[in-house]
Amino acid sequence: MEVLLRPVTPEYLDAALRVEQGAMQNHCYLADVYEYYLTTAGELTGAFVDGELAGIGKLTVLWDGSGWLETLRVAPQWQRRGVGTAIYRRYMEQAAQLRCPYLRMYTGAKNVASAGLARRFGLETAMLFREYALPASPEQGDGAGFAPVPADEAAELLAPWARRYNGYLVMNRTFYRFNEQTCRGLAQNGRVWRHEASGTVMVAGARFQSDKGLHIALLEGDRARGLAFAQLLARQRGAGRLVCNFALENAELESFVRQNGFAVTGGDLMTMEIRL
């Protein structure tokens, strides 16, 4: 079976949405992010068999130059027939062309098929994570004293927390490696906040689908104060919920979110990576 690979240009978008619907049922987001994907480095690849779009997959270059593998979808009738493998080969070609120092992805901790495909191309488990969410409150929220952190100050401000967060900052299930380039990029996009008087620091925002959730990637200092500010941001941005995703080892943060009404969204997740 021959699999032809080409970019998913706008004329193929409807077919790509059908592939996603077939593969993911109610967990679809491509329609919301396609225009955003066009602004990023890295290709949304389409895998065609006999002229039919059978699968899609996106490589996105993040702030630190690493490649993030996402939106890998194969239509049910084409699964386990080499389509996913072909897309992964294209991932590796792009990574070489774009000089990505790392490739990373995430999947469910119990998703044997997805993890197995990644391991065939050298990716290994890096960390296990758990995701919590809390409905946004229309009444709660207080932002007094919080200010955005300048990009040239973000890395130094956030560095002390890198170990506690096991080296990752997570938004929209995009697992950013905790480093200077990531901290600068987050700050440049208005996602790093500080309350000077209390020493509270928060990284919050959304990579995309800002109306679906405000993602809290880091919360330190007076966490109750930070959570109140997160509620305010969610209300201002029309986000339906607060989402927090962190490594299983971060028991202190897990205890805080549970005590404040957050609930686990589903099964645990894992991020996998390869150094190129």
Stretches with model-predicted labels:
Residues 95-110, 237-247:
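Conserved GNAT acetyl-CoA-binding A-motif
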Residues 85, 109-127, 249-264:
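Conserved active-site alpha-helix within GNAT-family acetyltransferase domains
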Residues 13, 20-58, 164-194:
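Active-site rim helix/loop that mediates acceptor-substrate recognition in acyltransferases
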Residues 104-107, 124-138, 263-274:
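Conserved catalytic-core motifs of GNAT/GCN5-like acyltransferases
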Residues 121-210:
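Amide-forming acyltransferase catalytic core, primarily the GNAT-like/NAT-type
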Residues 46, 52-60, 68, 73, ...:
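Conserved beta-strand in the GNAT
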Residues 61-69, 79, 203-217, 264-268:
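A conserved beta-turn-beta hairpin within the catalytic core of GNAT-like acetyltransferases
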